[in-house]
Amino acid sequence: MAGRGSRLRPHTLTVPKPLIPVAGKPIVHRLVSDIAKVLGEPIEEVAFILGDPAFFGDDVVESLMELADELGAKGSIYRQDKPLGTGHAIMSAKDSLSGPAVIAYADTLIRADFDLDKSADSVIWVKQVERPEAYGVVKLNGNNEIVELVEKPKEFVSDLAVIGIYYFKDVGVLKNQLQHVLDNDITHGGEYQINDGIKRMMQKGMKFVPGKVDEWMDCGNKNVTVETNQRMLSFLEKEGESMIADSVQQENANIVEPCFIGENVVLKNTTVGPFVSVGANTVIENSTIKNSLIQSDSKISNANLDNAMIGNHVVYNGNFETISIGDYSVLE
């Protein structure tokens, strides 16, 4: 979680990307909960690797510790002082690297329903994609085992893209290999990468297999985050999840589902939806809103929004359709 999420600015100027709500729940909260479902067993510890305390401060730590507590797990916080790559980030948490573990990048969302092969030394989670040349992919042998990781292949290797989630039967083995990477200064563009540790494990004959997820959703920028919100709302609706709080106040309002409407939201002379998420305590008046995310404690008036993303504590009175407004902004 140590990155700054620059492609999602202005929203990540005040809130780290993994804590931005999608369909009413922070990205990292959804991710960890969905991983827990696949594991199908109690989680003992959740370790979070954060960057500069000036950006990932006490409020971030509090939210993450609450997430660990919800899972009945111990929460641990580690700091990556410099952005020196995924391998370096993982080794920042080396005190927690023992036994079975999942390592995941915190800014992605999944839907997965597969049986985790815990007999393998590692399971690399993958998604079948249409343009494999744009991703890092896995190469399989005839036994459905991963024998190579290939970054953005120019010639077809496979269409199974690595999504940044890994299960290790004993993550201590990865730790030992990454320690070798750091000790020998094996870098790419000045960064230490998890792939070099994985490749060393493969060279030692360890068994890697793919775990195929059903859906893989990105939150890299505003447009894809809005799209991810749409997809997540659709999934939650199909699963029968209740997404409209009982405390919502409506006056001449219409909600076109699927939508997430948080606690104590006020809707007056307004149509909301489909595919809209509204955070708690937000007031929306005289507006039509679809395909958009609006966070908490904001006031929206006289708006006609489509494909919009509005942060927390925003006052907005206007008619730009596809606007993106960060926290604590006033546009009247």
Predicted regions and their residues:
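Catalytic-core segments of class I nucleotidyltransferases/pyrophosphorylases
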Residues: 145-233
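Conserved N-terminal catalytic core of the sugar/cofactor nucleotidyltransferase
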Residues: 7, 13, 20-21, 25-103, ...
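Conserved donor-nucleotide/metal-binding helix-loop-beta segment in metal-dependent transferases, i.e.
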Residues: 111-134
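Structural signal for interior beta-strand "rungs" in well-ordered beta-sheet cores
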Residues: 242-332
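Extended, small-residue-rich solenoid/repeat segments and analogous flexible loops
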Residues: 199-275
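The conserved acidic donor/metal-binding loop of glycosyltransferases
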Residues: 106-109
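Short internal beta-strands
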Residues: 47-51, 126, 293, 309
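Short acidic-glycine loop/turn motifs at beta-strand connectors
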Residues: 139-145
